[in-house]
Amino acid sequence: MRVFKGEVTALPPDKSISHRAALIGALSEGTTEIMNFSGGFDNQSTLGVLKDAGITLRQELLEGADGRTVRQVIIESKGLWSFQPPSAPLMCNNSGSTMRMFAGILAAQPFASELIGDSSLMKRPMKRVADPLRQMGADLQLSPSGTAPICIKGSKELKPINYRLPVPSAQVKSLVAFAALHADGESRIIESVRSRDHTEVMLGLDSFEQDGERVIVVPGRKTVAAKPFYIPADPSAACFIVALGLLARGSEIIIRDVCLNPTRAAFLNILTDAGACLTIENQRVIGGETIGDILVENHAALEPLLITDPQLVAFIIDEIPMLAVLSAFASGRFELHNAAELRTKESDRIDALVVNLQRLGFDCEQYPDGFVVKGRRITPSGTVVIDSFDDHRIAMSFAIAGKATGCPIDLSDIDVVGVSFPNFFDLLDSLQV
């Protein structure tokens, strides 16, 4: 039997907050200091496109008071229009967050630019990026299939917008907010289903409830003053370690300094309701974000997970792969609906999960907006080849199952975990008793 115990202090800094801290720093007037910035491939892609678009920044590794190495990023900017025409297409690699959110900034710059990515990113839908920016007066061109490259002829004369998000998307909400900061007047973004709210928190935007919807108010052409940011540990990364502890009976793990923003930590409530023994300790607020420690103790069996609420799906969209694999291995069952957004991620995550779970002997059926795991028909006798589909979250979800249960698996691409969790495998090894 495999058992995992220990204290986790080296969880990756939050990916979402790191992206936004860098982009907001580039939009701010003055010097922005970001402590504990993520070293993952996606966040480094954001720094790369900022540098290529004329923003002055530097990063260095520092030794913290507890002996840990932390990454500091310093950004120097003169404000909203500090960007310069790039000499070549801006490479976003595999980072959809970089491409989508930076498009909102480039739409307001008085020059032409082009955003490209790797083969996976170039297949992902970008019409949701173009639609609101075109309504604001920007000229954006996509491929005939509505994907990148995104060719932008920016304009300093963007119009304010009242934009109702057609689907819950923190990336689209953020790109509209970034563009609206440059507009000549006040804009409003309307959410019928909430998504993660880091951009609003970090920019200090006002919001209110109206007719059951959330309205976010973005002032136009208002100076964004530079301020320091601290990046807490990524709850989406913490989910993998939580699952590790819950799958391996007798395990006890404490995960330090995790972002517990209510729009990000809903997976903890789901697991607690299913019988998981999870305790939040040392809870506090830093820079507007709730942070705390998660204690994972494996004392009881988990009930199967049934996830159908669209609002809940929006809050746990990145954690669903791990929750699905955890529920399948722990209880034999899992059911998900209203999650069609999963088909537009780094891979078609619904299909990727079903294909790999079936290889492991689970009886699965997929739908346009989700899938169901009905039980395990057989337990494979030999090593099972798992296809990561070039998707870091698919790779890590099945790696956790293999590590915790001893199920022999062979991952098709282990390097892809570097997108968000470079020290993933080293951390797992350090926790095994």
From Swiss-Prot:
The lineage of its organism: Bacteria, Pseudomonadati, Chlorobiota, Chlorobiia, Chlorobiales. 3-phosphoshikimate binds at residues 15-16, 20, 169, 171, 195, 318, 345. Phosphoenolpyruvate binds at residues 15, 96, 124, 171, 349, 393. It is found in: Cytoplasm. GO terms for biological process: amino acid biosynthetic process; aromatic amino acid family biosynthetic process; chorismate biosynthetic process. This is 3-phosphoshikimate 1-carboxyvinyltransferase. It holds the Pfam family EPSP_synthase. CDD domains: EPSP_synthase. It comes from the Bacteria. Monomer.
